UniProtKB/Swiss-Prot annotation:
One of its GO terms (biological process) is bicellular tight junction assembly. NCBIfam families: small_GTP. The modification Phosphoserine is found at residue 45. Belongs to the small GTPase superfamily. Arf family. Found in a complex with ARL2, ARL2BP and SLC25A6. Found in a complex with at least ARL2, PPP2CB, PPP2R1A, PPP2R2A, PPP2R5E and TBCD. Interacts with ELMOD2. The GTP-bound form interacts with ARL2BP. The GDP-bound form interacts preferentially with TBCD. Interacts with UNC119. Found in a complex with ARL2, ARL2BP and SLC25A4. The GTP-bound form interacts with PDE6D. It is found in: Mitochondrion intermembrane space; Cytoplasm, Cytoskeleton, Microtubule organizing center, Centrosome; Nucleus; Cytoplasm. A lipid is attached at residue 2 (N-myristoyl glycine). Keywords: Cell cycle, Cytoplasm, Cytoskeleton, GTP-binding, Isopeptide bond, Lipoprotein, Mitochondrion, Myristate, Nucleotide-binding, Nucleus, Phosphoprotein, Ubl conjugation. Pfam families: Arf (PF00025). Expressed in brain, retina, lung, cerebellum, liver, kidney, hippocampus, spleen, cortex and heart (at protein level). It comes from Rattus norvegicus. There is a cross-link at residue 71 (Glycyl lysine isopeptide (Lys-Gly) (interchain with G-Cter in ubiquitin)). The lineage of its organism: Eukaryota, Metazoa, Chordata, Craniata, Vertebrata. This is ADP-ribosylation factor-like protein 2.
Length: 184
């Protein structure tokens, strides 16, 4: 029995999943986390550092790391990569000006060895705002079709209303579960 098999079996018992939520500043990462946890989202301030929430969902114990996206904090993102099962990349669909910056940052994450194998969920947030780019437009702008190193999906959503957060999280958990948790 190899080390990987032993680790998978240990994780199977706990059904622990580590999710890392990243994206540019003001994309809505903290709002998504709070909404998913049933917390009030009326007063959200920029994350200077990180938030960690541990939640139960569908029999999984989710450890969600929400890391600030300001330019000055991005160099610290690599400190959170270890043992990540799923990467949630949050995009502000209404911020057309920073789509290229968003694409560049995402592509730099996808070549990180410590994120190899992590499932990628892209939340195209703020779909409720006028002028928000469609998922197809974001998929093209971020060059998602070129991603071969990770299983990925783009999911339109609104963190403020909570619309379509669950389908994204459920897909992410299904994909991680099929890779990490083996049947005995």
């Amino acid at each position: 029995m190899g080390l990987l098999t032993i680790l998978k079996k240990m994780k199977q018992k706990e059904r622990d999943v580590r999710l890392l939520m990243l994206g540019l500043d003001n994309a809505g990462k903290t709002t998504i986390l709070k909404k998913f946890n049933g917390e009030d989202v009326d007063t959200i301030s920029p994350t200077l550092g990180f938030n960690i929430k541990t939640l139960e969902h569908r029999g999984f114990k989710l450890n969600i790391w929400d890391v600030g996206g300001q330019k000055s904090l991005r160099s610290y993102w690599r400190n959170y990569f270890e043992s990540t099962d799923g990467l949630i990349w949050v995009v502000d669909s209404a911020d057309r000006q920073r789509m290229q910056d968003c694409q560049r940052e995402l592509q730099s994450l996808l070549v990180e060895e410590r994120l190899a194998g992590a499932t990628l969920l892209i939340f195209a947030n703020k779909q409720d705002l006028p002028g928000a780019l469609s998922c197809n437009a974001i998929q093209e702008a971020l060059e998602l079709d070129s991603i071969r190193s990770h299983h990925w999906r783009i999911q339109g959503c609104s963190a403020v209303t909570g619309e379509d957060l669950l389908p994204g999280i459920d897909w992410l958990l299904d994909d991680i579960s099929s890779r990490v948790f083996t049947a005995d």
